[in-house]
Amino acid sequence: MSGAYDESAMSDETTDSFWEVGNYKRTVKRIEDGHRLCNDMMSCIQERAKIEKAYSQQLTDWSKRWRQLVERGPQYGTLERAWLAVMTEAEKVSELHQEVKNNLLNEDLEKVKNWQKDAYHKQMMGGFKETKEADEGFRKAQKPWAKKLKELETAKKTYHMACKEEKIASAREANSKGEASVTTDQQKKLQEKVDKCKNDVQKAKEKYEKSLDELNKCTPQYMENMEVVFDQCQQFEEKRLNFLREVLLDTKRHLNLTESQSYATVYRELERTIVSASAQEDLKWFSSVHGPGMHMNWPQFEEFNPDLSHAISKKEKVKRNHDGVTLTQVTHGAEHGTPQTGDRGSVSSYEKNQQYSAEWSDDEQPPTAAQSASETNGGNPFEEDSKGVRVRALYDYEGQEQDELTFKAGDELTKLEDEDEQGWCKGRLDSGQLGLYPANYVEPV
């Protein structure tokens, strides 16, 4: 404050009241706190937006992974469609949470940022214009009353000191009457001292009472002036409180997906797809595609035709890839109009659209060592170590054919070749056995 009065020149018996000199500073500080609270609100919204973004990405990754697993797996028909609908739900909910993130950042956070910029004006020397105006308003309102208060404190102190001096003088004068060593002249001087002190006490008391009366007279005006400035601060704070309340309501509206029509539609569609799954329909489909309902070209008597002698028999259609793994190309017709699935790798021994050899023979034997050697050009199969990649099994797998590997979840093996178009990889167990396994049954070590 100015040199007219000193805030420290107050009685030790002060209270925590707003009306005490300097206690208006808490109201001024509230303005600065309001600016900081706007920053806190923006940080809060920003952190929630990061959570929404992360959750959205997790849903997308989860959906992508499991859609691939289900599509490659042995599940079929309407139940497969229902299962995949759960992935569709995740994708749509992911989009909704991404939208939540965008609304939080582009609407709620920006709204607080713009309001804060309009409400608080920084000064070149630091602080805010609103804080300075409030502080100066309180100082001006308090200055006359604080000056009178300082005069009152001085008068009070003088009065109390005079009372103390009068008490000491009276005690000395009373004690001197019982002492023979005190002369009459000394006794007279002590009495005069007492009289003077009493006179000083009376004067100090009158001045003290006058100062108190003057302070009381200016107190109503002091209170009125202080309340005017305080009300201005209250109005400013009211705007901030109402604004942040509005922001919180907007934030709630953006976060509450249960109020979103799009969110409700996602789960209506999911339920409709799941409910539409039919075991009977799936069983009928499987029977017609892979069971007794399949078309069959039953053997019939055929006359010899020399023009067809060059035709390739079914057995000659069997091809061998460079691994020595037999793949057949027997294709079933669609006479019954049954739907055909795409060529996708399987996560089980049964594949969608898996093709099996149409030939069998009592003479079939496992390939001999000589045959294996010829298929590898006489090379050592273990020489492939240098290009192998170590992988770990995610699930148990029981090989269904001689050229398939068998392993347990957690086992490690070496991947020798990347996934082929049917979703299989060539690998080698630590025992040295070579064979095929489903690509999505393992992960890199």
From Swiss-Prot:
Residues 327-390 are annotated as: Disordered. SMART domains: FCH, SH3. Residues 146-167, 183-219 form a coiled coil. Keywords: Cell membrane, Cell projection, Coiled coil, Cytoplasm, Cytoplasmic vesicle, Endocytosis, Lipid-binding, Membrane, SH3 domain, Synapse, Synaptosome. PANTHER family: PROLINE-SERINE-THREONINE PHOSPHATASE INTERACTING PROTEIN 1, PROTEIN KINASE C AND CASEIN KINASE SUBSTRATE IN NEURONS PROTEIN 1. Binds to membranes via its F-BAR domain and mediates membrane tubulation. Plays a role in cellular transport processes by recruiting dynamins to membranes. Plays a role in the reorganization of the actin cytoskeleton and in neuron morphogenesis via its interaction with cobl, and by recruiting cobl to the cell cortex. Plays a role in the regulation of neurite formation, neurite branching and the regulation of neurite length. Required for normal synaptic vesicle endocytosis; this process retrieves previously released neurotransmitters to accommodate multiple cycles of neurotransmission. The F-BAR domain mediates membrane-binding and membrane tubulation. This is Protein kinase C and casein kinase substrate in neurons protein 1.
